[in-house]
C-alpha cells in the first residue's frame, strides 16, 4: 500500500445539485482525507491551462465552457492508493457506464456533465495538485 495524493474537482453540475457534503462523506468513508480545498469560479485561462492536454481534442472547447459555467470545489485528497481509490469512487467517465453507487452514477447527468474530475495517475496527480495549490496549502492530517 502506498500513501498517495490525488486531485479531485467537484464540477459545476454537482455543485449546483448541492451534493458537495455528500461527496465529501464518500471520500472520508473510503479512507481519503481532504488535505487542501478551495471553492472557486474557474477563469477561462485556468480551465484551458488545466485541460491543456486535451487542447487538440474535439471536446476541448465544450469542456472549458462547462468548467467555467459555475463554481467548482477543488480538493487534494490523501490516502492509501488515493488515485485508484478516488477513481473507483467516481465510476466510469460516462455515467451510463458507471457502477451503481458511484459518484457519477448517482450525481452525473451525462458524459459531459459528469459530476467530478479525478487524477488518472500518481504523476498527473502531483502536477494537478500543484496547479491549484501551493505546497504550503496542502497539509497532511
From Swiss-Prot:
GO terms for biological process: CTP biosynthetic process; GTP biosynthetic process; purine nucleotide metabolic process; pyrimidine nucleotide metabolic process; UTP biosynthetic process. It catalyses: a 2'-deoxyribonucleoside 5'-diphosphate + ATP = a 2'-deoxyribonucleoside 5'-triphosphate + ADP; a ribonucleoside 5'-diphosphate + ATP = a ribonucleoside 5'-triphosphate + ADP. It holds the Pfam family NDK. CDD domains: NDPk_I. The keyword NAD does not apply. Its cofactor is Mg(2+). It is an enzyme of class 2 (transferase). Its EC number is 2.7.4.6. One of its GO terms (cellular component) is cytoplasm. It comes from the Bacteria. It is found in: Cytoplasm. GO terms for molecular function: ATP binding; metal ion binding; nucleoside diphosphate kinase activity. ATP binds at residues 11, 59, 87, 93, 104, 114. PROSITE patterns: NDPK, NDPK_LIKE. Keywords: ATP-binding, Cytoplasm, Kinase, Magnesium, Metal-binding, Nucleotide metabolism, Nucleotide-binding, Phosphoprotein, Transferase. The active site is at 117 (pros-phosphohistidine intermediate). Major role in the synthesis of nucleoside triphosphates other than ATP. The ATP gamma phosphate is transferred to the NDP beta phosphate via a ping-pong mechanism, using a phosphorylated active-site intermediate. Homotetramer. Belongs to the NDK family. This is Nucleoside diphosphate kinase. It comes from Xanthomonas campestris pv. campestris (strain ATCC 33913 / DSM 3586 / NCPPB 528 / LMG 568 / P 25). The lineage of its organism: Bacteria, Pseudomonadati, Pseudomonadota, Gammaproteobacteria, Lysobacterales.
